Amino acid sequence: MKELSSAQIRQMWLDFWKSKGHCVEPSANLVPVNDPTLLWINSGVATLKKYFDGSVIPENPRITNAQKSIRTNDIENVGKTARHHTMFEMLGNFSIGDYFRDEAIEWGFELLTSPDWFDFPKDKLYMTYYPDDKDSYNRWIACGVEPSHLVPIEDNFWEIGAGPSGPDTEIFFDRGEDFDPENIGLRLLAEDIENDRYIEIWNIVLSQFNADPAVPRSEYKELPNKNIDTGAGLERLAAVMQGAKTNFETDLFMPIIREVEKLSGKTYDPDGDNMSFKVIADHIRALSFAIGDGALPGNEGRGYVLRRLLRRAVMHGRRLGINETFLYKLVPTVGQIMESYYPEVLEKRDFIEKIVKREEETFARTIDAGSGHLDSLLAQLKAEGKDTLEGKDIFKLYDTYGFPVELTEELAEDAGYKIDHEGFKSAMKEQQDRARAAVVKGGSMGMQNETLAGIVEESRFEYDTYSLESSLSVIIADNERTEAVSEGQALLVFAQTPFYAEMGGQVADTGRIKNDKGDTVAEVVDVQKAPNGQPLHTVNVLASLSVGTNYTLEINKERRLAVEKNHTATHLLHAALHNVIGEHATQAGSLNEEEFLRFDFTHFEAVSNEELRHIEQEVNEQIWNALTITTTETDVETAKEMGAMALFGEKYGKVVRVVQIGNYSVELCGGTHLNNSSEIGLFKIVKEEGIGSGTRRIIAVTGRQAFEAYRNQEDALKEIAATVKAPQLKDAAAKVQALSDSLRDLQKENAELKEKAAAAAAGDVFKDVQEAKGVRFIASQVDVADAGALRTFADNWKQKDYSDVLVLVAAIGEKVNVLVASKTKDVHAGNMIKELAPIVAGRGGGKPDMAMAGGSDASKIAELLAAVAEIV
């Protein structure tokens, strides 16, 4: 077996499959493009779903890739085991309706065992297979695999909901008896026992059925096009080929671990407690790649995942004695390890470091809050005479504050308290069940549509015309091909068409189809791409249509021009965002409609009003500069040399269109555009908002809609000016400001009067001092307008030695507000209010010196006040 670096393994994999006629698919962005069913790209096949479900036919049915992936359903196990990771690389080879079982197994065996390639010893390889899949068993035997090395497994059948499914055969490497201390042997495989001896290095899925949850597996229909989908983990291959005990001792992780050693002053012990090193090394890889691909830490979705990873890594850094921000210092090391295939981490190093450091600094403040929360929980246990920290509270510390369970356990036990492990496990399981349910909900690839996949007739979209005559090639009605149709709805394919099929954020054209007499025979309501790329016209049929007949196709020209204004403006907006807020503000989604444009982009905070003003100004300057718009067809590499902005994650064919707007914007784009930027007329941003963690959205209008937006604003301003009696529009702001200042002065005067009234009332309240258990206290109901007045009472009380404890209750509307203040260490205000609040059907909490609560039962106020003497 060859000893190769991870980069050599990856390259040898790709080279082998290229030698078998496969095209190399570049690794896609970790953030899925146009796939709402996935939070992350989580496998090599995830980006190829459109090929497997038949919605798109690839140019080459043989594909290979090395795909960066993220899976986060098992974060808590990362660092504990030898092979769990959040971010990993999946090497794959795929056949879309081309070769099948025989070639997949034979070539796979060749790659693994040939001296020209990986050169694995054959006697170290074991294969599992689905018991009913005798063909795979026989093919392995034909390759020279001993029958004793083939293990039938009932679970070797791959399916996720409806869609492509089939048996799979897995390949394992035997690391020997040293990794099997109990000498269990092949039963480890047969019974699926977790072990370190037999390492799964490759899975070959034989996708031959359309799974249907409504019928038994034996009744699944065969796919019209059988597929091969395989996955081999680079980290596992590297561990085996580099003789590493775990994935973490490979060249993918050890350089990071060495840097952590320098930062911590601790030494990584492969046989000792090294969990924190592993967690940090794993999580910083995931963070670096995900942030580089446009995901940002936040409170929801993938942003929450990143925040959780970062916080877990920081806490493990603290366990190693690293108490300052440090994760951002590891980003260059991650970039250097992966540079040969993923140069983007080093290219975006400054931005990634900035985001990681900023998030670390924020978490440092959160840790203080979490520590305070734990202190409060422990104080509450002490007050209640309990000795166990509940699982739900441990989970909240873990989930909300990022506290590892081990840290909570350590601090709680140091304080003399036990841990409710079962309660924590229950809360954790509930969260995992919710997460897994969400994944399964949209995880299937969808059923193949044989009718659409069978369309092979050529069809060409003509960019530069709004009307043309063309022959009708295909009619599909009720999901069946037919020669003619006279009513209802149908799908049509023409030899050529002026109708743009929806793609790249640009909506489809609408229009009409006419016969040779000039009569409209169909209305085009939508156009989408067929699996083989032909524009597929959805039409409402008004009169007879037949295959082979020529028709005149006319698009709605006015609508197309309105869409083009918005599409061209989108390119200008994208460039302006780069110039004003930074290169990281890349497209995360777009929609170019007739009435407006919508542009989503990656950014870590709201765009300020001043920045929006600059962006709007810059776009309009380019419109007024009357820039010529040109399109060029070329290959991707030439386009990039021209400076074209490729949208990371998008797939481009051999020939791409480059849209250039003067010297201001150059992008790869297959959409339609104006001839000159001046045709846009006017550009106006109408809204900027956040739509998810690290993603912002701008909605803008152009041309007539932009003019109307400005006019509507002017009308609103005129109305305001009239209301405040401003002589001219320019005076309206000053008038509004004067009214605001006057209102503020009146509110201040009113507050001062309230304070004086409260002080006068306080004089009476503070005279009623009682004593119990050696503690002086005041317990009184007061008549105030809001809860803030209670705090004013407390502030006045603190100024003099009226009593040790103050308890105030006020009925405000339908609510009861309670305040407890304490000057003595013998009475904890927060604990006391937790006993008082339930009396008025409320709850609350606070600090030792001040606490507040809210309730709903005003009839029990007297009972609450009477209880103070007992509780104090």
UniProtKB/Swiss-Prot annotation:
The gene is alaS. Zn(2+) binds at residues 567, 571, 669, 673. SMART domains: tRNA_SAD (SM00863). Its cofactor is Zn(2+). Belongs to the class-II aminoacyl-tRNA synthetase family. The keyword Zinc applies. It holds the Pfam family tRNA_SAD. Keywords: Aminoacyl-tRNA synthetase, ATP-binding, Cytoplasm, Ligase, Metal-binding, Nucleotide-binding, Protein biosynthesis, RNA-binding, tRNA-binding, Zinc. Binds 1 zinc ion per subunit. Consists of three domains; the N-terminal catalytic domain, the editing domain and the C-terminal C-Ala domain. The editing domain removes incorrectly charged amino acids, while the C-Ala domain, along with tRNA(Ala), serves as a bridge to cooperatively bring together the editing and aminoacylation centers thus stimulating deacylation of misacylated tRNAs. Its EC number is 6.1.1.7. GO terms for cellular component: cytosol. HAMAP family: Ala_tRNA_synth_B. It is found in: Cytoplasm. It comes from the Bacteria. CDD domains: AlaRS_core. Catalyzes the attachment of alanine to tRNA(Ala) in a two-step reaction: alanine is first activated by ATP to form Ala-AMP and then transferred to the acceptor end of tRNA(Ala). Also edits incorrectly charged Ser-tRNA(Ala) and Gly-tRNA(Ala) via its editing domain. Its main location: cytoplasm. This is Alanine--tRNA ligase. InterPro entries: aa-tRNA-synth_II/BPL/LPL, Ala-tRNA-lgiase_IIc, Ala-tRNA-ligase_IIc_anticod-bd, Ala-tRNA-synth_IIc_core, Ala-tRNA-synth_IIc_N, Ala-tRNA_ligase, Ala_tRNA_ligase_euk/bac, DHHA1_dom. GO terms for biological process: alanyl-tRNA aminoacylation. One of its GO terms (molecular function) is ATP binding. It catalyses: tRNA(Ala) + L-alanine + ATP = L-alanyl-tRNA(Ala) + AMP + diphosphate.
